[in-house]
C-alpha cells in the first residue's frame, strides 16, 4: 500500500459513499480488476476509510446531530434541567432521532447473512449488474413527484421502508445513498429531507459495521506500523472528499437532478462487465 493508492482509495470512498454511485462497488472493482487494495491489512484500512466518511457526516450535519443528542438527554432527565425547571424540547430533532432508530432496526436482518453478502464483493460481473440497477433506480427517482413530509411529520412506516431498502443496499454495486433517497422520495418525503435522512441514517450503520470490523481486524490482523501514515492520509482524503460530495449533493437536491448519476452508473456497469470478461 503506497501513500498515493491510499489517498486514491480514500477519495473514491468519500465521493462514492455520498454520491449515489456505490462506494462498495467501486472499491471492489478497484480491488478485483486493478489489484488496488490495502493488502493484508485491508480490514483495518476499511475501518479508517469509513471513519473518515462518518466524520464528513458529522461536520456537514453537526447542528442536527447536536440537537438530537440534546433531545436524548432531555428525555433521560424527564424533560427537566438540572435545577428541575421544564425544558422546551425540539420536536423535529426528537422525531428525527426516533426515525433514525426505527430505520436502523432492519439492519439486524442482515447480520445472519453478512458473510454471504461479503462473498459478492469478489464477483465482479455481479457488481456491474448491480450498478446497472442503481442507474435504473436513479433514473426513475427523478420522474417521481416528491412529497412534503419532513422530520416533523414523517411516519414510522416511512422509516421502516427506507431502513429495509438500506438492508438491500448492502449488496455491492447498489448505492446505499441512492437506494435510501429514492425510497424516501417514494414514501412521500421532501427530496432534500430524504437526502438528509439518508445520510444521518448511515451513522449508526457505519458505527455498527466499523465496530464489528474493528473487533474482527484486531483478532485476525497484525497492522503494519509502517503503513499507518498512508492509512491516516487515506482517512483524511475520505473525510475531505466526503464533505465535498455532501455539499454537491445538497446543491443537486435543490435541482432534482439525481438522474444525472444514472448515466454514469450505466456506463460504469457496462464497462465493469466487459472488463471482468476480458480479465
Feature map (PLM): residue ranges:
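Multi-pass membrane proteins that catalyze or facilitate reactions on polyprenyl-/lipid-phosphate substrates
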Residues: 1-279
Amino acid at each position: 500500500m503506497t501513500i498515493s493508492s491510499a489517498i486514491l482509495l480514500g477519495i473514491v470512498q468519500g465521493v462514492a459513499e455520498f454520491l449515489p454511485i456505490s462506494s462498495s462497488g467501486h472499491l471492489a472493482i478497484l480491488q478485483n480488476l486493478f489489484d488496488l487494495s490495502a493488502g493484508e491489512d485491508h480490514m483495518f484500512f476499511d475501518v479508517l476509510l469509513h471513519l473518515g466518511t462518518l466524520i464528513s457526516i458529522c461536520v456537514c450535519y453537526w447542528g442536527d446531530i447536536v440537537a438530537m443528542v440534546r433531545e436524548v438527554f432531555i428525555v433521560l432527565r424527564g424533560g427537566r434541567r438540572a435545577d428541575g425547571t421544564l425544558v422546551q424540547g425540539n420536536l423535529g430533532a426528537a422525531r428525527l432521532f426516533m426515525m433514525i432508530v426505527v430505520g436502523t432496526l432492519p439492519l439486524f436482518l442482515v447480520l445472519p447473512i453478512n458473510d454471504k453478502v461479503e462473498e459478492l464483493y469478489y464477483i465482479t460481473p455481479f457488481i456491474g449488474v448491480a450498478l446497472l440497477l442503481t442507474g435504473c433506480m436513479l433514473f426513475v427517482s427523478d420522474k417521481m413527484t416528491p412529497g412534503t413530509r419532513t422530520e416533523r411529520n414523517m411516519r414510522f412506516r416511512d422509516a421502516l421502508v427506507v431502513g429495509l431498502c438500506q438492508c438491500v443496499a448492502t449488496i455491492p454495486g447498489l448505492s446505499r445513498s441512492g437506494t435510501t433517497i429514492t425510497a424516501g422520495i417514494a414514501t412521500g418525503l421532501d427530496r432534500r429531507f430524504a437526502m438528509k435522512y439518508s445520510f444521518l441514517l448511515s451513522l449508526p450503520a457505519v458505527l455498527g459495521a466499523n465496530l464489528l470490523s474493528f473487533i474482527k481486524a484486531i483478532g485476525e490482523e497484525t497492522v503494519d506500523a509502517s503503513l499507518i501514515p498512508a492509512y491516516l492520509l487515506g482517512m483524511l482524503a475520505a473525510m475531505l472528499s466526503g464533505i465535498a460530495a455532501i455539499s454537491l449533493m445538497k446543491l443537486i437536491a435543490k435541482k432534482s437532478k439525481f438522474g444525472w448519476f444514472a448515466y454514469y452508473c450505466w456506463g460504469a456497469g457496462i464497462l465493469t462487465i466487459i472488463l471482468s470478461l476480458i480479465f
